[in-house]
Amino acid sequence: MIVARAHHIGTTGGEERGMEVGVGLPTTTPGADGRCLLEWARRAEEGPFASLGVLDRMLYRSVEPFAALSAAAAVTTRVRLVTMVVIGPLRNTVLLAKQAASLDLLSGGRLTLGLAIGARADDYQALGVDQAGRGRRLGEQLAELRSIWEKAEVGPEPVQPGGPPLLAGGMSGEAFARMARSADGYVHGGGPPRAFAGAAAKAWAAWRDLERPGRPQLWGQGYFALGDADPGSAYLRDYYAFTGPFASRIAAGNLTSGRAVKDFVRGYQEAGCDQLVLLPTVSDPAQLDRLADVLA
């Protein structure tokens, strides 16, 4: 089984380790209601998946990520819950710390908090937040979150000592430096394995530049809709419409066959990924069974 931590020599870190595969909740896809999200969470818990991930978007027909993961926490006990990613600078840091600590408590210590700055100007405008300086603000947030949790200034106290693991995303030099300074690992925004490999190498380099002990967690993501290519790709073109023509390139990366999924997973394994979260582009819970069969 691909998800069962098949060991390999990581190309970015030079050490032997395995990769787990998680799955996303369809919080942004058409047709997903509360019942659908709970069914996804239950099936993921029963299947071979290591985590449940969610996206974050303000001006879209999407479910708020902490609400979605709280619902998932209520019907699961095993899978890790991860934000892929929450747009940190859109949120008050104290409130964000409380939301994350609350979810960590409710889930029994299963939250991994991925944060990034986002690229959609309309989300910032909707909340009256200045997009300028958002990278600096995220860097401050990463440090402040740890301080808030460690000092127990805002309850509840997280189950995980020091708070949930923090992942930071982004592709600029400062984004990698920010990750190495204040996070526990790096979360990649998606794309083919070669793109992840390049980003992972930069994450490792930033980590080593600061002479941090241990190693960064490396998380990746991709999109899939097995047997449902047309609606899945249409969703991606809509979701990424703000990127213009690039949206069609993203849609072309939708994994719609078993062979495509296997090749994608293998590529991320070889690139040194620790956990790959496959995000659905259609909301049918039967997708989980199809994906589990492919990964078996």
Short names for language-model regions:
Residues M1-A296:
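Active-site-adjacent structural elements that line small-molecule/cofactor binding pockets in enzymes
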